């Protein structure tokens, strides 16, 4: 896969995220997909990721902006940094109570690509910063 094709794949993935289009996000993912979150558990497989997205859509409304995507020359890896703006809609287990609070975070993500699909995404953000923002 070329660097240009990888960039288009990541752009499609994040456009689907902003549209809350789970089907398109899942279509961007390859066999054996793995989702790592710096502040949470590892999820293996599209089914687990779809369950995660459903939970996220219930508890949060989030939009990404200022997305900067970088790719390796062979297109096998990519990284992205972006601004995430969100609203906390429903209390998530183990987190402060939700009351429609807004928050803004800088997030980084790293991707592995095989056969034109994302096989791993690792997302990194500051949970302490998010907590400070929603507690007030």
Region annotations inferred by a language model:
Residues 1-136:
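C-terminal and inter-domain tail/linker signature
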């Amino acid at each position: 896969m070329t660097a240009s094709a990888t960039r288009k794949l990541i752009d499609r993935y994040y456009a689907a995220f902003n549209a809350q289009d789970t089907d398109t996000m899942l279509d961007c993912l390859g066999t054996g997909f793995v989702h790592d979150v710096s502040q949470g558990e590892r999820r293996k497989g599209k089914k687990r990721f779809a369950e995660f997205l459903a939970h996220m859509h219930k508890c949060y409304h989030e939009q990404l902006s200022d997305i900067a995507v970088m790719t390796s020359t062979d297109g096998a890896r990519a990284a992205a940094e972006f601004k995430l703006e969100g609203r906390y809609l429903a209390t998530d287990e183990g987190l402060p109570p939700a009351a429609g609070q807004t928050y803004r975070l800088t997030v980084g993500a790293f991707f592995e690509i095989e056969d034109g699909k994302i096989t791993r995404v690792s997302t990194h953000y500051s949970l302490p910063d998010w907590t400070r923002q929603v507690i007030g």
